Amino acid sequence: MPDELRLFLKERFGVQGPLSPGRFEAELAKRLGSPARRAPLLKAWRADLAQGGREAVRSFYREGLNVTKAEALVYGMHHPHLEFYAKELPPRVEGRVLEVGAFTGALVGFLQRKRPDLEWHALDGVEEAVALGKKRVPEVAWHLGWAEEVELPPFDTLLLLSVFPEGLVDQGLESRLAPEAFWKRFAFFERLPLFARLLRPGGLLVYGHGPFLGKSPEGVEEGLRRLGFDRVERVGEGEYFLVLARKPEALAAVRLEEREAPPPEEAEEVAVALEEARALLEAGRYAEALALLPEEAEGEAAYLRGRALFALSRHAEAEEALR
């Protein structure tokens, strides 16, 4: 499967292989020597990293399609996740399938080749990406628009892969977030229902966080359950995971409780304790980390307590802490 995907990406999209996001600017300079030609794309890239938002995302991808070979670099940064998706998705998807944020169609095009028996659709909010996608991957039906707003008949499978966090991530964000921090950071309970409009009741939602910071597979799983999704399951671990779930007839309304902010001195003490607990967990000193985290812990403290309990094989207590 990896070799088949790599050949497809190379032949249709000019992708040479994986590219670390930290190497994007250097690789762009290597492939496009003129500073003047790459300046607009670099400006859009840095704006996307610094401030995010829909317009920053649109600008980056639009400028990327105006620069020769930059499209391939974009796919290079997503390459390892594309390999993971290409391996795990074909046997799981069904019916009419929509990929949200398909860019120029590399993933949806490959999946269509693996499952030609299904009806494949691609959605993107960048007009230039859709126009090029129709040429690159004419085998799928293309739609222009942003998932939160577009009106389309509901699908049997909805793919939210490396798209939900985009535009809401900055370089100061932690790699992993506790569930509540994840819900707040990405406005999960406000935004997810807007995407889920495109999925029929009983249809399959597939969430992949992609190469972005702020991962929380536990947050995705618990968030979907709170919204009423059932048959929630996770595939993969660590950097590479998918969460699959079935949409209910009607989504539940979920509102996070607003907690009163603690006094500055107390907040500082809590922050220090959390930092120490994280360090102890990383060092494998689980019992010591647990001693810093009270049973009534909430938010990130509860998440860290659950991790410590799992590591100590106290699974029932861990599940209670992570609820």
Label each PLM-derived region with a short phrase:
Residues 49, 53-88:
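Class I SAM-dependent methyltransferase Rossmann-like catalytic core
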Residues 104-116:
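Conserved SAM-binding loop of SAM-dependent methyltransferases across substrates and taxa
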Residues 126:
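Conserved SAM/SAH-binding beta-strand->alpha-helix loop
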Residues 150-158:
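A short acidic, Gly/Pro-enriched loop at the edge of an enzyme's catalytic core
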Residues 157-185:
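A short SAM/SAH-binding and catalytic strip from SAM-dependent methyltransferases
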Residues 178-201:
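A short glycine-rich, Lys/Arg-flanked "PGG" loop and its adjoining helix->strand segment in the class I
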Residues 202-209:
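Conserved beta-strand signature within the Rossmann-like core of class I S-adenosyl-L-methionine
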